C-alpha cells in the first residue's frame, strides 16, 4: 500500500472512534436530561451560555439533550 492509502485508513479509524464517543456521550446526556427535564427556554439559554454551537437549526433538539454536559457534548 502506498502512504496515502495508509493515511486514509488511519483517518477513517480515528473519525469512527470520535463519532462513537460523541454518540455515547449524547446518549448518556439524553438519558440524564430525561431524568432532569429542562424547558426549551432553559435548554436554549444553557446552550447559548456554553457556546456549544448546536443552538441553531435542526440540531436544536440535540442541544436540549446535551445542555447538562459542562462541555456541551463536544469532543
From Swiss-Prot:
Signal peptide residues on this chain, from the entry's feature table:
1-19
- Give the protein's recorded name: Mating pheromone Er-2/Er-9
- Its biological function? Mating ciliate pheromones (or gamones) are diffusible extracellular communication signals that distinguish different intraspecific classes of cells commonly referred to as 'mating types'. They prepare the latter for conjugation by changing their cell surface properties.
One Pfam family in the UniProt entry: E_raikovi_mat
Q: What is its main location?
A: secreted
Propeptide residues? Answer: 20-35
Q: Where are the transmembrane segments?
A: none
* InterPro entries linked to this entry: Pheromone_Er2/Er23_protoz (IPR016057), Pheromone_protoz (IPR009064), Pheromone_protoz_sf (IPR036245)
Amino acid at each position: 500500500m502506498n502512504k496515502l492509502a495508509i493515511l486514509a485508513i488511519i483517518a477513517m479509524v480515528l473519525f469512527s472512534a470520535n463519532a462513537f464517543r460523541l454518540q455515547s456521550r449524547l446518549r448518556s446526556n439524553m438519558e440524564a436530561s430525561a431524568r432532569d427535564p429542562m424547558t426549551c427556554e432553559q435548554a436554549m439559554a444553557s446552550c447559548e451560555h456554553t457556546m456549544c454551537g448546536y443552538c441553531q437549526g435542526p440540531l436544536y433538539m440535540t442541544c436540549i439533550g446535551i445542555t447538562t454536559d459542562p462541555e456541551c457534548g463536544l469532543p
